[in-house]
A protein has these predicted regions:
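Extracellular/oxidizing-compartment recognition motifs
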Residues: 1-277
Length: 277
């Protein structure tokens, strides 16, 4: 099965994303790959589970609000029933760059590598409010159970600024709210100070919201990666307890390898080189 998630922030599209309108074009370059071409053999479903979170809106787009009760869980699996999905509609054709005029999409050969993705464990919890934490939770070796009708806050420190997709796997907790707030530093009275200090400070930044549906092993992952050092996780449960099975990041970025070298007798010059990595 070939399953694709297609998204567009619409009026909240960030400056870094050049887009005409929502669509998907796939072209296979061999007799076998041609099966993947975007023709009427494809089916589509408009997912109503997502809505834009515009708290702390910046020029990097909006954040996500995901209502798990509306999400088509298992859509990417071979045994998923897509009977209610509809046939795609052609809205335009792609053309090679420099050929023709009046086109909507231009197909260009990719000349840079794809972005990498790898597991990035979150480093430590600097502060926890409303719950006692198992010591191995962030290592993926222990679950965290939040009782019904409870409010909990976790202040997570990656210890360095990174770009990653935070991923949270939960079960139960129908109608709960899980809120992610991302920041490079903590704030006090609207001001940043030493990035290592947290006492009397709070996290201000991009906000994702996830509303679990009570199902098992539900995965929340934002549509686009987040940039953060700190994550504040606010959880409010209703009539059901919420089990957090795991919380981690999936680091992403373009490959960046140190192919050159530098050496000299001045230590401060060596430190400048090291800072770049």
């Amino acid at each position: 099965v070939l399953a694709v998630l297609v998204w567009n922030f619409g009026s909240y599209t960030p400056g870094a994303q050049m887009t005409l309108k929502t669509g998907l074009i796939v072209q296979g370059n061999s007799s076998l790959e041609v099966q993947a071409n975007t023709d009427k053999s494809w089916k589509v479903y408009h997912d109503p589970a997502y809505s834009p979170s515009i708290e702390y809106l910046q020029d990097v787009g909006c954040s996500d609000i995901l209502n798990a009760s509306l999400y088509p869980w298992g859509w990417e699996n071979l045994d998923y029933n897509d009977t209610d999905w509809i046939e795609v509609r052609t809205i335009g054709r792609g053309q090679p760059y420099g050929i023709g005029s009046g086109y909507d999409w231009i197909l260009c050969k990719r000349d840079i590598p794809f972005m990498e993705e790898s597991l990035l464990r979150m480093n430590r919890i600097r502060r926890a409010e409303g719950i006692d934490l198992p010591s191995d939770f962030l290592k993926g070796k222990a679950e965290l159970k939040v009782p019904a009708n409870q409010k909990v806050s976790l202040f997570i420190d990656q210890d360095f600024l990174t770009t990653a997709y935070p991923e949270l796997i939960v079960s139960g907790g129908k109608n709960s709210l899980v809120k992610f707030t991302y920041s490079e530093a903590m704030f006090k009275d609207g001001e940043k100070a030493n990035r290592n200090e947290i006492e009397g400070r709070d996290v201000i930044g991009f906000v994702d919201k996830f509303y679990p549906d009570g199902g098992s092993n539900r995965l929340f992952r934002p549509l686009w990666f987040r940039t953060y050092r700190y994550i504040k996780l606010d959880i409010e449960t209703k009539d059901e307890p919420l089990v957090l099975h795991d919380l981690y990041g999936m680091y992403t970025g373009y490959p960046f390898k140190e192919n050159a070298s530098f050496d000299c007798d001045l230590d401060f010059m060596k430190q400048i080189w090291e800072t770049g990595w």
